[in-house]
């Protein structure tokens, strides 16, 4: 990004076709967090365009205020707390809840940090565990990452939170990235398709590409980073 333009990027490095469909949602949609009496309900403040995974839930999207949300796999995610009676939020609609209700990262962090609901995480249609974490960014360039670890929500917020991949957890990704920063990206970068290696490469290249106010050049630069960290299907 430069001072006036923010260009987010997303690669879908899933092992199979997630049967994605695009949906355009208007403002004023009434929603509920789960098929349960003990859930939260809301009416969407903002319209959004989203991508559905397996056509059962929102995994990525952007709302009319420029808030972008992306849901990625994280093996370490654990939502369970003993004797938890908070209202239920289905993992499949968590991303949509954020897009419906918040215009900025600051707003989302302020509300989600209250932890007023618990996450319900049924298995994915292919049998995989739905262990996921969420990243968001807004039109100002601010970003945040949300990870449920041992039943507690851990939030990382700031303009420096520009890259998220998969395992390990974000704090450990930063530690690994610090090591490679000492070596220097022009000397050597890790080249495997492991999430930690892709995190390091993306973190280096997102700062190495030209920081420009030209929209076409900026988009091309982000795509070049995405190609470098994409994993072939299969």
Predicted features along the sequence, with ranges:
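C-terminus-biased signal that marks the final domain/tail of proteins
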Residues: 1-7, 120-122, 129-131, 139-141, ...
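Catalytic cofactor-binding cores of redox enzymes
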Residues: 114-152
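A short, surface-exposed interaction/processing loop segment used at functional sites
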Residues: 15-36, 154-181
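Proteins synthesized as precursors that undergo proteolytic processing into mature forms
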Residues: 85-122, 208-211, 215-226
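Short acidic-glycine loop/turn motifs at beta-strand connectors
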Residues: 2-5, 63-65, 138-141, 147-152, ...
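A contiguous strand-loop segment
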Residues: 1-86, 119
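Peripheral peptide segments
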Residues: 61, 74-75, 150-152, 207
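Generic beta-strand structural signal
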Residues: 58-60, 65-67, 95, 132-134, ...
């Amino acid at each position: 990004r430069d001072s006036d333009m923010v260009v987010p990027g997303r690669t879908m490095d899933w092992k199979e076709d997630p049967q994605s469909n695009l949906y355009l949602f208007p403002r004023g949609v009434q929603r509920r967090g789960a098929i349960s009496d003990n859930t939260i309900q809301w009416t969407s403040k903002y319209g959004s365009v989203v991508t559905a995974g397996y056509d059962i839930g929102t995994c990525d999207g952007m709302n009319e205020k420029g808030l972008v949300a992306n849901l990625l796999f994280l093996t370490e995610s654990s939502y369970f707390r003993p004797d938890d009676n908070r209202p239920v939020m289905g993992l499949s609609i968590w991303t949509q809840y954020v897009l419906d209700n918040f215009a900025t990262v600051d707003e989302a962090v302020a509300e989600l940090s209250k932890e007023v609901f618990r996450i319900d995480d049924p298995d994915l249609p292919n049998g995989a565990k739905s262990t996921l974490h969420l990243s968001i960014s807004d039109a100002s360039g601010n970003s945040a990452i949300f990870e449920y670890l041992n039943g507690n929500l851990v939030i990382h917020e700031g303009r420096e939170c520009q890259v998220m991949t998969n395992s390990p957890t974000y704090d450990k990704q930063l530690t690994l990235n610090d090591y490679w920063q000492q070596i220097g990206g022009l000397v050597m970068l890790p080249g495997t398709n492991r999430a930690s290696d892709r995190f390091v490469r993306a973190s280096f290249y997102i700062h190495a590409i030209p920081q420009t106010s030209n929209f076409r050049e900026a988009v091309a630069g982000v795509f070049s980073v995405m190609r470098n960290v994409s994993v072939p299907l299969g």
